[in-house]
Regions:
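Bacterial N-terminal signal peptides that target proteins for export
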Residues: 1-8
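Conserved functional micro-motifs across diverse proteins
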Residues: 22-235
């Protein structure tokens, strides 16, 4: 099945680069580097504020529009979905296995429970109600709803947990919060998720207004890209 995924990757990559080159010719002042995760990843699929990456073990998708609208603010919110792939044993993902790498290459851990309870994040929650993108796109085998409960809105009946069990049938979704020293800045970030045998580094860029305008024209619909990547092998 991998060769079919790789064929899809090549087509998306060529089309994306061609589009970017055309745009750069028209607006040469805008320069955006293609991110290098530094780890083996079969594919990174990009929508405007949605990023997804996977390898032979696991799949992670994120939505970060709220973070991109929070320039200068101290707290970052990211929506994350994750699962493990077929023929991979169930895996217990713990909160200390998730972190963000900032543009200056510093590592930012997930906000702990005490830190989350001590701050008022109602503005982020309100922003998320109008500025979120759907990330409910998973490989076909992951069809059972699953909550990533590292955080829960204060006052809600939901509880916060330190871990979540992933399996190839579970499509797990939840919010992540990080305290960013010095506030959120423009530039290249990575969401790092450590699985049992591998690390996935999902790239996401906090875009300037010019970058958003340029790149928004070049990213296809994320759902179509995911469906193409995980399309069953033809017999």
């Amino acid at each position: 099945m991998q060769k079919y995924w790789l064929a899809g990757i090549a087509a998306v990559a060529v089309a994306g680069l061609a589009g970017l080159q055309a745009e750069r010719q028209e607006k040469p002042k805008v320069q955006v580097q293609i991110p290098d995760p530094g780890v083996p990843q079969i594919m990174t699929m990009e929508g405007k504020f949605v990023r997804a990456a996977y390898n032979n073990e696991a799949y992670v998708i994120i939505g970060y529009q709220v973070a991109n609208r929070s320039i200068g603010e101290e707290y970052m919110m990211i929506d994350m979905g994750t699962t493990v792939l077929d023929n991979v044993p169930a895996y217990v993902l713990k909160r200390d296995k998730i972190a963000v790498t900032a543009p200056d290459n510093t590592t930012i851990p997930l906000l702990d429970h005490e830190g989350y309870r001590s701050v008022n994040l109602s503005a982020l929650d309100a922003r998320a109600k109008v500025q979120r993108d759907s990330i409910n796109y998973f490989p076909p085998m992951a069809s059972q709803a699953c909550r990533v409960g590292f955080f829960a809105e204060l006052g809600s009946p939901a509880r916060m947990w330190d871990e979540v069990e992933l399996s190839n049938r579970r499509a797990c979704l939840g919010r992540l919060f990080f305290k960013v020293p010095g506030g959120i800045k423009h530039g290249q970030y990575f969401l790092n998720v450590q699985f049992e045998k591998s690390l996935l580094r999902v790239p996401f860029r906090i875009l300037t207004a010019d970058e958003e305008k340029l790149l928004g024209k070049n990213y296809g619909d994320i759902r179509k890209q995911v469906q193409e990547a995980f399309k069953p092998k033809k017999k």
